[in-house]
A protein has these predicted regions:
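Bacterial N-terminal signal peptides that target proteins for export
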Residues: 1-10
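Intrinsically disordered, low-complexity peptide-like regions
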Residues: 2, 20-22
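Bacterial N-terminal signal peptides
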Residues: 9-19
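Extracytoplasmic copper-binding redox domains, predominantly the cupredoxin/blue-copper superfamily
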Residues: 22-237
């Protein structure tokens, strides 16, 4: 009886601490803006593999390397907390992240995950792909997936922003993953917006990364239950 009471009280205390920590969590929201002349849309040339062309029924596929949205913001920018979490430990997320080779392109083009979080790699195409990850801080991997529906699971052992993933069979295929030791990151959507939730109160340096335009950093102080706005602006080349 005493043991059951002790277990109940321990569970109750942990629940209260968990609820309090999350109820006091802060949020960073914002946009990644684009300034300058909007670059022309670049189409991918898939002539090296007739199966890829057939998948798209002859239609051209736009590159996701630089996507300027209708409101002059950038899609596919990786935004994350770069500094301010030193000394804090966060449990590794157990849910799988996924990257799919579909239509001879990677889905998603940019994403984030935690170090040692499982990454499921899927080939949804009826053609040969190989996925070649090129981290500098973790062990690279390069494996073939010759059959439709094949799945493999890999991890990155160490944080790194960004890790390039490519296909040696199809030169136009590329994706980028931000690997972190914490879960505080986001990727801009088709409105250029991002949201980073669940932050402890503190002073942070937030970085926005873009495949073409590089990086920018901003400093922000987030209070308990606070929501702060941080906007970035990249200028076209």
């Amino acid at each position: 009886m005493k043991r059951n009471t002790w277990l109940f009280l321990s569970f109750l205390a942990a629940s209260i601490l968990f609820t309090a920590a999350h109820s006091d969590a802060g949020t960073i929201v914002g946009k990644v803006n684009f300034k300058g002349t909007k670059p022309p849309v670049t189409m991918i040339t898939m002539g090296a593999d007739q199966k890829c062309l057939k998948m798209h029924e002859g239609k051209q596929v736009p590159s996701e390397k630089t996507v300027v949205n209708s409101n002059n913001t950038l899609q596919w920018s990786f935004v994350y907390v770069k500094k301010g979490l030193e000394g804090k430990k966060f449990p590794v997320a157990k849910d799988k992240k996924s990257i799919d080779q579909r239509g001879c392109t990677y889905h998603p083009h940019v994403f984030g995950m935690m170090a040692n979080q499982p990454l499921e790699i899927v080939n949804s195409d009826a053609t040969l792909h190989n996925i070649h990850a090129l981290p500098k801080n973790s062990t690279p991997f390069n494996m073939a997936q010759p059959k439709q529906g094949m799945k493999n699971v890999k991890t990155f052992a160490t944080s790194e922003v960004m890790v390039k993933v490519k296909c040696d069979v199809h030169s136009w295929m590329a994706a980028y993953v931000g690997v972190l030791d914490h879960p505080f990151y986001s990727v801009t959507d088709d409105k250029g917006s991002f949201e980073i939730k669940g932050l402890p109160a503190g002073d942070y340096e937030v970085e926005a990364w873009h495949e073409v335009y590089g990086t920018q950093t901003m400093k922000v102080t987030v209070g308990a239950s606070d929501t702060k706005t941080v906007d970035f602006t990249f200028t076209g080349k």
